[in-house]
Amino acid sequence: MPKTALLRPSSDGVAADLMTSLAGLLREWLPRQRWFAGKDRPVTDLALLSMTELYPGCLHLLVHTGHPNPSHVGLRGVPAPGGALSSGDCYQLLLGVREQLPPGLGRALIGRAHDGPLAGLTVYDALYDTRSAQLLLERLRHPGTVGPLRFEADPSVRVPAGLAPRLLDAEQSNSSLVYGDAFILKVFRRIQPGVNPDLEVPGALAGQGCGRVPAPVAWFRTTDPFAATLGVLQPFLPDASDGWTLALGALAAGHGFTAEARELGQATAEVHLALASAFPVGPLDENARTAAAMTERLEAAAHCVPALQPFVPGLRTAFRALLSCDVGPPAQRVHGDLHLGQVLRADREWFVIDFEGEPSRPLAERCGTQSPVRDIAGMLRSFDYAARQRRPWRPEWARRCREAYCAGYAARADWDPREKHGLLRAYETDRAVYEVLYEARHRPDWLPVPMAAIERLAVRGG
């Protein structure tokens, strides 16, 4: 009998011992994954929160990784004096377990277990395995339960059987499987309690008749050790190009991007209007509280990225200016991480995807109401990012795109972002600070891009 046949959800003793087999492998493998959020902090602890055998040879795990407290840790994960081991994350893993690694799955290899219930077996990332990906889709096609896992679907949408899967290779904070160029399944990696906004928001917008966002077709979630969304299946747009690729193509060809930017501004406004109808609108943002939160994030980022420290006094002025400027539009549900990589263009129309928000922020914050200026600032920063991908830098290209985007937004909304200079500068500054911390942790070669914006925002005020 294969050893994995012993790993049933009811086998509490075996499940409790599973980390004996996996802990050493995962300590090495997890920090190398693009979606692992703790790259700048050492993995100090691993704990199995939940284990379910989806089918023989495929284990679904929720694993908690412990890290030193971020407030006591340097950028490269070296605990500062007095550091406490108190923070961590929960990750979703689908692991294949076989005696030998299937052919063609070298990239999926995690390692061979030497101890515990999996001793002598090869462990790999099952999302790379065609058979595992097909069986996962079958679970979604036939709603039901497997241990604490719940598979659910929109009964009005038919998902055909036998769609060939392929795992997308793009850099992202989750893993995505495309099935037959008809559907895409996003498997969330970092799991937090509650309904993931990438399920909640597209579902609500579909109810509003908003065609800018692909609607959920099926999804799966867990009830143990807490209720949480694990993955969402949506229609796939096979002929679409993301905004980042299109913008870089325009730059390479020496073309403008203003028409597309204006239409993108209109699409953003339409999504914001639909969000304001689908979810309760909050009060006008309290600028004092917003300024305090932005300043706190700035101080934390400067602690981790020394290059930021000389600009802190100038950046604080952008946040202090909130105390005397127009409060702007009411707070509402927003995208939360809007940039050119989060929009698709197909058939001359823009679509908005990935409503998770910034994954590093708590889920409760990402699901709360915020100023729509935050999304606008994110997109304006993205035009600057694109313009800086070529030498020499094309500041006029970025300026024209920013202007066109805001004009398009104003044409659909009842207010003009260009008239909210103080708000826009503060949110752009906050976004640039986030970018500095992100790039320093994940892509150090890109750090000069947001640092150039930091200098502009701190010295010249926008």
Please give the residue ranges for each predicted region.
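ATP/Mg2+ or Mg2+-diphosphate-binding catalytic cores
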Residues: 396, 400-418, 422, 426-462
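Short Lys/Arg-enriched alpha/beta "domain-start" segment
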Residues: 4-48
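Active-site catalytic-loop/activation-segment of kinase and kinase-like phosphoryl-transfer enzymes
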Residues: 283-321, 400-410, 437
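Conserved catalytic-loop position in the HRD/HxD motif
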Residues: 337
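Pre-DFG segment of protein kinase catalytic domains
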Residues: 333, 351-354
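Conserved ATP-binding subdomain of kinase catalytic cores across diverse folds
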Residues: 67-295, 299, 348-349, 356-391, ...
